[in-house]
Amino acid sequence: LVELIGVIPALVVSALFPIVSGLHKESIDSLRKVYQASFRYLIMIALPVAVGTLLLSGHLIYTIYGDEYVKTVPALKILSLALIFIFVNYILMNILVAVNRQMTNAIMAGTCVFVNIALNVCLIPRYGYLGAGTATVITEIVLFILGLYYVAKYICKTNIVAVASKPFISVAIMGTFIVLTTARLNLAFVIILSALTYFTCLLLFRFFTKEDKMILIHLIRK
C-alpha cells in the first residue's frame, strides 16, 4: 500500500522535471522558483496522505486486504510517518540531478544504505517487521536532512516553517474531522470529505499563490 502511494510523488516530479531541467539552462532564479513551488506541492499532498493513512490504517487494511492482514496495521502506521519524507525526497534528489550533482546523490544514497543496514541489524532481531518499518522511517529522515543540506548548498535554502505551516494547520483540522467521523461514515465518504475539508482549509488560509496558478497553466499546456 505504501509503495502504491509512493507513485504519487513520482508522477508529480515527472511532470515538473522537464521544466526544472530546462530552467537550469535558462536561469538559476527560475529553477529556484520551480523547486520551491514543487516542494510546496509535495508537502501539500504528503501531509494529508500521511495523516490519512495513519488514522485510517485499520480501515484501509481491512477493506483492501481483509481480516488476515489486520496484524500489519501497526507496521502501516509506522510507515505512514515515512510518507512525508518519501514525497519530499523525490524533488530533493531530482533537483540535484537537474544541476548535475549526480555524485552528491550517490553520496546521499550510499549513506542511507549504510544507515538502513545498520538499523535493520539492530532493530529487526528484536522488533521484527516493526523494526524494519522504523528503520525505513529513520532512513528517509536522514535522506531528507542530507537533501535539504545539499539543496541549500547548491541551489537555495528551504524555509520549511513557511512552506508547511498552512498545510500543517489544515491537516490538523482534517485529522480531527477523520477522528470524529470514522465510526459513523463509510470509509469512502470519510476519505472524500476529509480531502474536501483539507483543501477548503488551504483555500481559506490562502495557501495558493498567483505563481501556483501560472505553473498549473504551464503544465496543462504541456
Q: Predicted regions span which residues?
A:
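Helix-terminus/linker motif at the lipid-water interface of multi-pass membrane proteins
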Residues: 1-5, 18-22, 58-68, 126
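Membrane-proximal transmembrane or re-entrant/amphipathic helices at the cytosolic face
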Residues: 176-222
